[in-house]
């Protein structure tokens, strides 16, 4: 949907869309329409949805918000490094993402719906495995991300000795688990979320990450920043 909204200036005419199923990642959808509106788009999220072409008006100032979905990685670093405290602040542009982060923190073995925050799947699974455990739901669509993010997360966690079981729309994670150094190189399937979470875990126990450079897609300089924290591995 985001791609269609941003491509709509080049449409030859109006395009009628029919949306099926339950809405997911609603915060990103709303942001897409907002960005387009700031550039002159008349299109709005309505039902039925019609996207019309429009002339682009480039704003003089473009404010790019911080990547909120990276915050769980900071939490994960603090969980595995007892003496590490990071100076982080949470931007508030996506309330649905904030609700999801809070739900992970409060899981206590319960259910966490990540339907509006599927980018949190991998760090959330590691977070729950090392703390109270829980069940991640609402993320069947994560199988169509840069990788099958459910299967990829389970595979990656297993290399660190962390267990998770796949479910129809997510995964079940037992809490109170412990990290172990991977024996084999860690495959990330060129998925930046898998790579960054794997690097955070490896900062505690070590490991060889395949395709670590893909993290630049989301966070340029991530590897340098992680090394600058002075962790032992």
Question: Where in this protein do the model-derived segments appear?
Answer:
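Short, structured segments at the rim of ligand-binding sites
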Residues: 1-233
């Amino acid at each position: 949907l985001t791609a269609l909204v941003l491509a709509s200036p080049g449409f030859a005419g109006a395009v009628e869309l029919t949306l099926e199923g339950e809405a997911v990642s609603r915060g990103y959808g709303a942001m897409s329409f907002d960005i387009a509106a700031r550039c002159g788009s008349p299109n709005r999220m309505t039902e039925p949805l019609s996207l019309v072409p429009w002339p682009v008006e480039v704003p003089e100032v473009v404010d790019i918000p911080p990547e909120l979905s990276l915050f769980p990685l900071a939490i994960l670093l603090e969980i595995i490094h007892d003496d590490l405290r990071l100076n982080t602040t949470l931007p508030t542009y996506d309330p649905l993402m904030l609700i999801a982060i809070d739900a992970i923190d409060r899981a206590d073995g319960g259910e966490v719906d990540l339907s509006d925050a599927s980018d949190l799947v991998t760090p959330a699974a590691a977070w729950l495995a090392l703390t109270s455990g829980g069940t991640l739901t609402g993320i069947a669509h994560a199988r169509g991300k840069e990788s099958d993010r459910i299967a990829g997360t389970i595979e990656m966690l297993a290399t660190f000795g962390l267990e998770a079981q796949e479910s129809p729309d997510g995964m079940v994670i037992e809490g109170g688990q412990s990290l172990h150094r991977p024996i084999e190189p860690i495959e990330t399937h060129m998925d930046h979320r898998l790579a960054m979470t794997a690097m955070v875990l490896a900062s505690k126990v070590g490991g060889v990450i395949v395709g670590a450079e893909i993290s630049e897609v989301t966070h340029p300089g991530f590897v340098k920043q992680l090394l600058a924290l002075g962790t032992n591995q």
